Structure formats: structure tokens, C-alpha cells
């Protein structure tokens, strides 16, 4: 872990240190808000220049044009500037011109561009176009009957696109029956694989991606279980307690002494502190388990995640969401939202302060340096989210 991160130079929380960032009610100080706003404007200009050389055919939310649309949609929600909505419209239109026709998910498939387009059209009062996008999104389910179950390329990634639409419309545009049908397929496939690979003595559910049993949020168990525990999926009480809870407990048993988690089952290397692999993604499963099952041990494990992220979360890989400092900071905001403990808001502010020196630490340059999940767009999204900390949610994942 240590060799993949910069040493954390910041003192941990105390009340007097935090006063430079927010007041006792958790409202950011005008000075810190201004610093965030200035950086958002500066990075947006850099990003727009950089996007001129981006891949014109990448339609995805993860690294492509739909991700830039998600950023501008978010900026519109935060600042209310209609120019941001127009920018979102332009970018999502570009993404719809180059759909993959084979992947269905929100982050890496056609589900993302269609879901984002539906929401953008809805906010622009283009209800006919919004309905067309929703119809196409619902029909995507037929494209890949053999999809895995994980977030980036699988069924949960499709479900996240459906929930994104319902959340932003404030009503059930995607029928609950459609969502539950896919959810049942995820549960059944997890039971089948656990039996087939003889995991049933340890866990009633198991999932794989490319013959690996991944643990983290992007490809693995933590991301799948986080969604299965969401009230909006309406998993039955019996299945929550008999299938999901013992499967969550199995993931908890994989924890390293550091408080971190392995990238895969049976991987003993304690290396990665990323949203995609490790504690910064597993923490969402733990906080959701605490909300649903009311057992203190899940919250204690989440606190351990936060501590290891604070120590090793300023990543040499960069400032992005998937495997960068901004993505790691969202773990603190998630805990702050749950507990209202000012320590976690302070830690998020300090990671944001690191991001205010974007490009000055000698981090490696991502393959897609201006994208939402690997690059600058994700950092801008985080800095804007931090302006109203209680509303902050990890984009395209956290509900």
C-alpha cells in the first residue's frame, strides 16, 4: 500500500483545525468554498481544451462523452446555470452517436448514455425524447443474456442505469417489475455459482468476472451486495437475511489486519486502496449493511476502512474517481452522511485540498486524462459535490 500512495502530510481531525473548512453545522466556510469554486472553473477550462483530442468514438460514462455529460448535469444541479445543462445535452448527444450495441451497463455500456440522455431531455422539458431513451434503455436487457453480475460490465451496472433514471425523474419511469426481474437473475446466478464452485459452506452467493472472484465495488462482491441491500430493489426480507447478509459477512471475513480488503478472494496481497479494488469501495457495502441490519460491527469495519484510506489514500495513480484521491475521498463523505461525525468531513476536505494542487505531485497521467472515472472530470465532480457535503454521492454508483 505504502509504495502506491504519497505519505499523508496532514494532521488528522481536531476541532480547531476543522474551523478553517466548515462550521459546527457542517457548512463550508466562504473562504474554502471560494477556493473550490475557483479550482472548478480553472479545471473546467483545462478539461475542455484537453477533450479536443479525446477519442471521438468513446460513448461511455466511464471514460467517454457520456461521463462528461454526467459532470455537466451535476454542475447544473449544483449551480443552476442553464449553460451547464446545454453542455450536458451536447456531450450526451455525441455519446448517442457511437453506442457499442453490445454492453448494457451504466458505466461501460449503452445503458449510461441512454439513461443520462433521458435525464438531460427531461430537465430540458423534451419529454418525447426522454421517453424514447427510456424505451431503448428498457429494451437493452435483451442484448446480453449471458452478462456477468458486476457493476462495470454486468447486470448490476444495468440496474444502476435504471435506478439513475427513476431517481432523477422522481417517479417510477422504469417499472419495478423490470428491475426486480433482473435482481432475481442476479440472486439466482449467485446461488448457482456458489453451488457449482463449492462455496456454499462459506457463502450462499458467489460471483465471478473473467474467472476471478473479485471482492471490490467495480467488478466484485461489494458492489453487487451494496445494490442488493438497496430498498429500491425490494429484495425480500427472507432473501436479505438468508442470502445477502451471510454473503456480506463472508466479505467481512476477508478483511486484512490493516482494515483493507483483497482485490480477489484468496489474494493475500494487501496493496490496493481504490474504489474499484479495496476499502474505498467495500465501505459502501458496510455502511449499507449497517443501515439495513443495524449491527454495530459493520459500522466498526467501515471506520477501519476510513482509517486505512486516510493513511494510504493519496494515490500516486492520480486524482480521479476509480483509482484516485477524489474517489477515495467519497468514502469519508459517505461516513459523514451516515454518522454526522465531523472527522470524516474534515478528512474529505483535506483530500480535496490535495486535489486543489492538481498536477503538482508527480502522479502518473491516466490513459484518458480528462474523463469522468479516470481523469479530471471526476475530480471536478468531487470538488463540486463537496460544496454541499450532505448531498454528495459517488457518481454513477452511490444511491
Swiss-Prot record:
Its main location: cytoplasm. Glutathione binds at residues 317, 364-367. Keywords: Acetylation, Cell membrane, Cytoplasm, Membrane, Metal-binding, Transferase, Zinc. The modification N-acetylalanine is found at residue 2. Expressed in brain. It is found in: Cytoplasm; Cell membrane. It is an enzyme of class 2 (transferase). It catalyses: RX + glutathione = an S-substituted glutathione + a halide anion + H(+); 1-chloro-2,4-dinitrobenzene + glutathione = 2,4-dinitrophenyl-S-glutathione + chloride + H(+). GO terms for molecular function: glutathione transferase activity; metal ion binding. Belongs to the LanC-like protein family. This is Glutathione S-transferase LANCL1. It comes from Bos taurus. The lineage of its organism: Eukaryota, Metazoa, Chordata, Craniata, Vertebrata.
Amino acid at each position: 500500500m505504502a509504495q502506491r500512495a504519497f505519505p499523508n502530510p496532514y494532521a488528522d481531525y481536531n476541532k480547531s483545525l476543522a474551523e478553517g473548512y466548515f462550521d459546527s453545522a457542517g457548512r463550508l466556510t466562504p473562504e474554502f468554498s471560494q477556493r473550490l469554486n475557483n479550482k472548478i472553473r480553472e479545471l473546467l477550462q483545462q478539461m475542455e481544451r484537453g477533450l479536443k483530442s479525446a477519442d471521438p468514438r468513446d460513448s461511455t460514462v466511464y471514460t467517454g462523452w457520456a461521463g462528461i455529460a454526467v459532470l455537466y448535469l451535476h454542475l447544473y444541479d449544483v449551480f443552476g446555470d442553464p449553460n451547464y445543462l446545454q453542455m450536458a445535452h451536447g456531450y450526451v448527444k455525441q455519446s448517442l452517436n457511437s453506442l457499442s450495441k453490445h454492453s448494457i451497463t451504466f458505466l461501460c455500456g449503452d445503458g449510461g448514455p441512454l439513461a443520462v440522455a433521458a435525464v438531460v431531455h427531461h430537465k430540458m422539458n423534451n419529454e418525447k425524447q426522454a421517453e424514447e431513451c427510456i424505451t431503448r434503455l428498457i429494451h437493452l436487457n435483451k442484448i446480453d443474456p449471458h452478462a456477468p453480475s458486476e457493476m462495470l460490465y454486468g447486470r448490476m451496472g444495468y440496474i444502476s442505469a435504471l435506478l439513475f433514471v427513476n431517481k432523477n425523474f422522481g417517479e417510477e419511469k422504469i417499472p419495478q417489475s423490470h428491475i426486480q426481474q433482473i435482481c432475481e437473475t442476479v440472486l439466482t446466478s449467485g446461488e448457482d455459482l456458489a453451488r457449482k464452485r463449492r462455496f456454499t459452506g462459506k457463502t450462499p452467493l458467489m460471483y465471478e468476472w473473467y474467472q476471478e472472484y473479485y471482492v471490490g465495488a467495480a467488478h466484485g462482491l461489494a458492489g453487487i451486495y451494496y445494490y442488493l441491500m438497496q430498498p429500491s430493489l425490494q429484495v425480500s426480507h427472507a432473501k436479505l437475511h438468508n442470502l445477502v447478509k451471510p454473503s456480506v459477512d463472508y466479505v467481512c471475513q476477508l478483511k486484512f489486519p490493516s482494515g483493507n480488503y483483497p482485490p480477489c478472494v484468496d489474494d493475500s496481497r494487501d496493496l490496493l486502496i481504490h474504489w474499484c479494488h479495496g476499502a474505498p469501495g467495500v465501505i459502501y457495502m458496510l455502511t449499507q449493511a449497517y443501515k439495513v441490519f443495524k449491527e454495530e460491527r459493520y459500522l466498526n469495519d467501515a471506520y477501519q476502512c476510513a482509517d486505512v484510506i486516510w493513511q494510504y489514500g493519496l494515490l500516486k495513480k492520480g486524482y480521479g474517481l476509480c483509482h484516485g484521491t477524489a474517489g477515495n475521498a467519497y468514502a469519508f463523505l459517505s461516513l459523514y452522511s451516515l454518522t454526522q461525525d465531523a472527522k470524516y468531513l474534515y478528512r474529505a476536505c483535506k483530500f480535496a485540498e490535495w486535489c486543489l494542487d492538481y498536477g503538482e505531485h508527480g502522479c502518473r497521467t491516466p490513459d484518458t486524462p480528462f474523463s469522468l472515472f479516470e481523469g479530471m472530470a471526476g475530480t471536478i465532480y468531487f470538488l463540486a459535490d463537496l460544496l454541499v457535503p450532505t448531498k454528495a454521492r459517488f457518481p454513477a454508483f452511490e444511491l
